[in-house]
């Protein structure tokens, strides 16, 4: 899968990296999880995705055509931010491309930026 970051996401990472020292490693682990969700064969992927989304770990925000926008809890090694970071990304399933759209802490804001999602959805 190909990964890209939108400019606003880079700003989010820069701001949070000051408080969350393990952030880059946490994002790398998230990439492996995304690979498991979307990089498998269709039959394996459907069952794994169903089980993963059934928990409180992630949810599909929007689905238009072959693009899914997903919000996922980002697991971190930094104690004070454990369970509080959220990663929003768009997956173009047919192209095997993932765009990281937003990274935020629940301490800073309660929800994702809807305007940013509309800008990058599709």
Could you tell me what each predicted segment is?
Residues 16, 50-56, 82-86:
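Short amphipathic alpha-helical surface micro-motifs
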Residues 28, 56-71, 104-117:
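Charged, low-complexity, helix/coiled-coil-prone segments
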Residues 27-34, 45-48, 106:
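Residue-level signal for alpha-helical context at structural boundaries
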Residues 3, 70, 98:
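A broad, low-specificity signal marking well-ordered, structured residues that form hydrophobic/aromatic
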Residues 74-122:
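Enriched for short, Lys/Arg-rich terminal
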Residues 21, 25, 39-42, 46, ...:
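Short linear functional motifs in flexible/disordered or boundary regions
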Residues 1-40:
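Arg/Lys-rich, positively charged N-terminal/basic patches that mediate binding to nucleic acids
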Residues 37-78:
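A short, surface-exposed loop/turn module that caps and links secondary-structure elements
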């Amino acid at each position: 899968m190909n990964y890209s970051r939108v400019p606003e996401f880079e700003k989010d990472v820069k701001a949070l990296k000051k408080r969350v020292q393990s952030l880059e490693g946490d994002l790398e682990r998230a990439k492996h999880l995304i690979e498991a969700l979307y990089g498998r064969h269709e039959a394996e992927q459907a069952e794994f995705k169903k089980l993963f989304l059934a928990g409180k770990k992630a949810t599909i925000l929007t689905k238009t055509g072959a693009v899914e926008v997903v919000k996922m809890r980002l697991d971190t090694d930094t104690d004070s931010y454990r369970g509080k970071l959220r990663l929003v990304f768009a997956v173009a399933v047919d192209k095997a491309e993932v765009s990281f759209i937003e990274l935020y802490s629940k301490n800073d804001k309660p929800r994702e930026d809807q305007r940013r999602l509309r800008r990058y959805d599709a």
